[in-house]
Amino acid sequence: MVEAGDFRRGLTIEYDGQIFQVIEFLHVKPGKGAAFVRTKLKNIKTGAVIEKTFRPDERMPLAHIERREMQYLYNDGELYYFMDTQTYEQIALNQEMVGDALKFVKENMTVTILSHNGSVFGVEPPRFVELEVIDTEPGFKGDTQTGATKPAKVETGAVIQVPLFINVGDKIKIDTSTEEYLSRV
């Protein structure tokens, strides 16, 4: 059992007899009245997203989720193919199931496939990835403003904000959960 006040992004719960994944949550403490937790929940079977408000002390059961490490093989334009590195079993998932999870994932990287009762519902990328910058504006001498950033395109096609000293060809470390630059490698 988990209390609504302990919700985190990615947590899976049972609610109204169905399995939901917490997409967003916000703890609200109004000036007057009791605190509450405003959430966006995604039904893992149908993909439907609902908004629901809970009291922070409201309890609900956690859903048991199976996690399998698999290697991302390729995308044929329609489906994404993954392989279990121990059994060599391959599965194909559509864009709806994958979502933005592969935004920072190259072919042959290891990802986590999420399933419930044998039914796959999502993909979790590795927490940190190292990618090469393929396009960005050059940094100029004197661009030393604190915290200044510029857009940079990495080899997977995703665009993130990076510090001004990053150039084309640099390898950078990215946190996939926040989609933020961490360091130069």
From Swiss-Prot:
Location(s), subcellular: Cytoplasm
Main location: cytoplasm
This protein's GO CC annotations: cytoplasm
Pathway: Protein biosynthesis; polypeptide chain elongation
Tagged with keyword Protein biosynthesis: yes
Pfam families hit by this protein: EFP, EFP_N, Elong-fact-P_C
GO molecular function, one term: translation elongation factor activity
Coiled coil spans: none
Keywords, comma-separated and alphabetical: Cytoplasm, Elongation factor, Protein biosynthesis
Protein's UniProt keywords contain Protein biosynthesis: yes
Gene3D superfamilies membership: 2.30.30.30, Nucleic acid-binding proteins (2.40.50.140)
Any Gene Ontology biological process: peptide biosynthetic process
Protein purpose: Involved in peptide bond synthesis. Stimulates efficient translation and peptide-bond synthesis on native or reconstituted 70S ribosomes in vitro. Probably functions indirectly by altering the affinity of the ribosome for aminoacyl-tRNA, thus increasing their reactivity as acceptors for peptidyl transferase.
Assigned protein family: Belongs to the elongation factor P family.
PANTHER family: ELONGATION FACTOR P, ELONGATION FACTOR P (EF-P) FAMILY PROTEIN
NCBIfam families in alphabetical order: efp, PRK00529.1
Protein name: Elongation factor P
UniProt source species: Caldicellulosiruptor saccharolyticus (strain ATCC 43494 / DSM 8903 / Tp8T 6331)
